[in-house]
Amino acid sequence: KVVNFGSVMNELFEQKGRKLHRDHMRRQDIGLQSRVQLQAARRIKRMAMKEPLIVDTHMFVRTTDGLWPGTPQKVLEELSPDAIILIEAKPEEIAKRRRQDTTRERETNAPEDATADLEWSRYMASANAVIAGIPIKIVNNNEGGQEKAALDLLRIVEKTNTVDHP
């Protein structure tokens, strides 16, 4: 089962009386974001006790206070992942997909911003992997290669499910 971290956070914001477009969550007070992030991690952890999960999340979020880790240490400890799988594409393709996605509100869709986002995602993933003692895998999701990317992801998840991490 796949659970989207941002969707769980959005549900929690709504329960607090803050109905927000998902791109407005990152504009909230950083302390509030941090608390809701931890609550979301706890909710997802409870879900994971029932069945294996893939948590779809961002490694970082651009907030009004700067870059914020998508999985800060407390969140990482709650989630206790077995692996980190980064799904990447070429910066030009990411920028194109962002421009075509009319459901989202992004400040910029330039390829150079996508390049920076890929770099920051790897930095954050590296930090998480060191803290949690888990591997990082990268799946390329380039234009026309979605089926291959899905199969690569499936193979990694199947292999990860058979490995017992400390």
Cite the ranges covered by each PLM segment.
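A solvent-exposed, charged loop/short amphipathic helix patch at secondary-structure junctions
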Residues: 95-115
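Class I S-adenosyl-L-methionine
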Residues: 14, 95, 99, 126-133
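A short acidic, glycine-rich active-site loop
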Residues: 28-35, 108-119
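Short, hinge-like loop/turn segments at secondary-structure boundaries
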Residues: 19-23, 102-104, 155-156
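NTP-dependent small-molecule kinase module
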Residues: 122-166
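ATP-dependent NMP and nucleoside kinases share a basic, alpha-helical "lid"
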Residues: 57-102
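ATP-dependent small-molecule kinase phosphotransfer cores
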Residues: 7-69
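Post-Walker A helix-loop "phosphate-sensing" segment adjacent to the P-loop in P-loop NTPases
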Residues: 1-2
